[in-house]
Amino acid sequence: MVDPVACPPKAGVELADIVRQFGPKYTSQYGQGMMPSQKRALADIAACCTRELGGRLYRCDDCHDSFWRYHCCRNRACPKCHGSQTRQWLEERQAELLPCDYFHAVATVPSELHAALRSHQKLMYGLLMRVAAEAVKELCAKKKHLGALPGILAVLHTWNGQLGYHPHVHLLITGGGITADGQHWEPARGAFLVPVAVLSSKIAAKFRDALKDEAPAVFADIPAGVWRREWVSFCKHYGHGNDAVLNYLSRYVFRTAISNARILSMDQTHVTFRWKDRHAETWQTERLPGVEFLRRFLQHVLPRGFHKVRYYGLWHPSKRTESNRAWLLLILQTPAGTTEPLKLTDLLDVLGQLPQRTDQSLADLGDDEPECPRCPRCGGTRTRLLGEYSRSSGP
């Protein structure tokens, strides 16, 4: 379903331009092996912000000019469509934020497993996200590390800066958790949450065992030596409170494999884009044939129905009561530098602030009705909507 969100003005070469120019050639060469979600992504991105999706007609009361704003496709692989999604999704997440420290962890898999992950995406991506979160929960449950249940938000990424295949999971973890009796909030001990070496080996073992139990045929096709390869993970302190969470969400949740800002140019045969070399901390450029660029991009389009953002621990939907209790325990903590306990009136105020949770997910976002845009001719703000038109009925 097309969401009636008007697109912003176009600036520079965009992914949609590349899809329109090289998409037909790519489809003719590789169409038989494409997933339905990849075909849908090409079609949606090509139609995004064109008359194909319909749009709105506005009139400027300053210069009396009329102009069109076409609808976005809202495909999650489209880099142009994430602005309105980001704003609305963040509003929905406000009720789930806990006023505490946060940690950022990353779980990667050895390159020898990449072929298996690519061939069984729904199964193995889901396993990787689940076992990474389970490993964090199990380590945090030990009293020598935390002795409590944290909140975990897991995000799947499959790319590196050059659009290569690099599946890994980012985890945002609360710097503390609620104890088993539900009576206390146990904070993390400074900048330490769990030992990274133990976390890596635990994720590897849990992934191997889960795959063997749940998909024995897939497990049998993987050489035994692969499981002796080292898995790499890290976990570090990320920040405190809402700012840390919002920064994390903007950096990791609302990301596509490439943004329009990174696309530098396109000619009749090639695409040039920039990428960040994380080792040298410098920006590099790469020039690829257009079809190869689309091949790299499309390998990061996820199967239809796969949820790349998942919640575990305190943030799992089944833990609403515990999460609300954790929020209350954190709010009721005596402010730093004071010795006065909270009074009954303070408690009532806090209870009135208890957030109302929703079950809305990224896939369920509703319409985002924008305000009337500025006039592209004179820059005036006195614009008004004349009408909305369905697919292909615009000029």
Which residue ranges define each predicted feature?
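Beta->alpha loop/short-helix hinge microenvironment recognizer with preference
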Residues: 1-395
